[in-house]
């Protein structure tokens, strides 16, 4: 699926007034929250980012919370991107290596921790836009391109022990 091109056209329960971003029950982005499990921009072939967007912390107010890992070129094989999300923190992994943690701020309200309500989970390959184009104009010779996802799995943590992040071993077995 694709997001609407007009940021004010999202299906939401928000009013059209200017105050919509200051209302806790408004489910429009960034109020609703977003966790980018994987963000990749083409001009940084070896870099993968995990990002948490909230009303209190997103690109408009320069308070974005993100982590980055530098790895082998990610466009040559499938990689495992893992997210461990709990009531107090969010951890991101690539191929079993931890590289980002977002800790719930002390005294957090909905503006900095909306992740106890419905929110967006995103896998993102950026071509164009302010970030994806930061390396210069888009080279049209790269098209057509595609993002392939082998699988997405969601597990519920039972709360009795820390979740385990599994790594694939040689041969593709677990």
What are these regions (language model features)?
Residues 1-174:
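GH16 jelly-roll
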């Amino acid at each position: 699926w694709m997001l609407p091109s007009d940021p004010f056209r999202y299906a939401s329960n928000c009013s059209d007034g200017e105050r919509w971003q200051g209302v806790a029950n408004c489910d429009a982005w960034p109020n609703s929250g977003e966790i980018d499990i994987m963000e990749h921009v083409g001009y940084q072939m070896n870099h993968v980012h995990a990002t948490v967007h909230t009303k209190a912390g997103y690109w408009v107010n320069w308070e974005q919370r993100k982590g980055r890992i530098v790895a082998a070129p990610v466009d040559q094989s499938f990689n495992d991107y893992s997210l461990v999300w709990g009531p107090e923190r969010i951890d991101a992994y690539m191929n079993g290596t931890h590289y980002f943690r977002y800790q719930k701020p002390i005294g957090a309200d909905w503006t900095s921790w909306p992740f106890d309500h419905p929110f967006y989970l995103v896998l993102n390959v950026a071509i164009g836009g302010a970030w994806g184009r930061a390396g210069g104009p888009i080279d049209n010779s790269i098209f057509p391109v595609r993002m392939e996802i082998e699988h997405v799995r969601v597990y519920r943590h039972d709360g009795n022990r820390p979740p385990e992040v599994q790594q694939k071993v040689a041969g593709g077995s677990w």
